[in-house]
Amino acid sequence: MPGTAKKATARVPVTRERALRAAMAVADAEGLAALTMRRLAQEVGVEAMSLYHHVANKDDILDGMVDLVFTEIELPADGDEWKPAMRARAVSARAALMRHPWAINIMNSRIASGPATLRHHDAVIGCCLQAGMSAAMAGHSFSLIDSYLYGFVMQESALPFDETSDIPQILDEMYEPFPANQYPHLTQFTTEYIMKPGYKYGDEFEWGLDLVLDSLEALPRV
């Protein structure tokens, strides 16, 4: 006799990493405010109470999400030359932060650092120390590079356009209410630079990063 009962749909088991990845997807799409235990439970297909077998609370989720972001950052390896290694690390960190715009506000706020976070910090400090820097100079360098990195990403994320936007059209709309030649220097700047074909604000990052790294490299390492 042919069976008529429907086979039960196999559930994908919930793991800590699956829950954290789902939490990141919610935050990427809608921001941290949208992330609740109930919403996360819906995303992974379980009751909210079942999540507590895998995560302790929302702080634990945020700790885990931050640690996953750090896994996306290219780390200096032992023996790497300082400047290219720190450059590659900063470029990859910017890319990770742009993929996860919620992360910038909490990346360095977590008390319970995860293994990827600690590996990242250890590798960056290690690269500086192996380049002959004192502990103090390593700290200064790390702080300066990350101040530039985080500041640039915050500004880039807040812009009313991205690399896919029609920048000339946006600028026309911005300046339309003002009389012609009211802001001559700004007009010259936008015409001669921003309106040029191929302009991307993101390209400013590597120009500034190289300036920071060149300046640090020229300083005494003690």
Where are these regions (language model features)?
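Basic, helix-initiating cap at the start of DNA-binding domains
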Residues: 1-39, 43-46, 55-63
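N-terminal intrinsically disordered/low-complexity leader segments
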Residues: 1-14, 74, 184-193
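Alpha-helical structural segments
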Residues: 18-25, 30, 60-76, 85-92, ...
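Amphipathic alpha-helical segments used for helix-helix packing
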Residues: 64-66, 94-116, 122-123, 154-158, ...
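Hydrophobic alpha-helical connector segments
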Residues: 74-119, 135-138, 145
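Hydrophobic alpha-helical bundle segments that form small-molecule/ligand-binding pockets
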Residues: 120-144, 148-174, 197-198, 216-220
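A structured, mid-to-C-terminal "fold-capping" secondary-structure block
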Residues: 166-222
